[in-house]
Amino acid sequence: MIFQTPIVTPFGGAEHDWSAIELAAWLALSLGTTLRLLGTEADPASGRRDASRLLARASLLVQQVVGIVTEPLLIPPGDAGDVEAAADARMLVVGLSERWREEGIGAVRGAVGRAARAPLLFVRSGSHPRGVSPPQTMTRFTWTQATRHAQTRQPTR
């Protein structure tokens, strides 16, 4: 049974965003619903291109790894676009900023959290590689962990 209310995830391609879409995709699959990926529209004044290529790549990876079809949607930058696009969401899954330890969740995420009608889950990446993210996004934590493991292994005799 497919529910009409999607899991919604804003996506900008940052490390924690990849973890958020992976978790959101698995939630959507288990709940029998769809996944809506949000990316920003172009801003000609600042020379910023839209996120359509990024959303297409993420959508393809989600489809290949998790097996669900995503709904990419371009929205205006800022919290208002996220809130409007998530108005019918079953759940909102949001990756934290790379600066979350120093700055907290940030102004936009805070505004989305206050205005969201659906349950909201903030996600950060862990030390384990993800199945959805492209190989070049392997984190420094994973490399550090692998290095420590190699250094502590005892030679076999």
Predicted region positions:
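Charged docking surfaces used in two-component/phosphorelay signaling
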Residues: 74-80
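Short, flexible loop segments at the rims of nucleotide/cofactor-binding pockets, characterized by
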Residues: 13, 69-74, 98-99
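Redox- and metal-dependent alpha/beta enzyme cores, enriched for Fe-S-associated oxidoreductases
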Residues: 13-66
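Short beta-strand/turn micro-motifs composed of small residues
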Residues: 11, 39-41, 96, 124
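Short beta-strand elements at the ligand-binding edges of bilobed clamshell
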Residues: 6-12
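A structural signal for isolated positions on well-ordered beta-strands in alpha/beta enzyme cores
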Residues: 8, 34-38, 71, 121
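Generic hydrophobic alpha-helical scaffold/packing signal
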Residues: 8, 25, 55-63, 71, ...
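Gly/Ser-rich helix-loop-strand patches that form or flank binding pockets
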Residues: 1-6, 83-150, 154-157
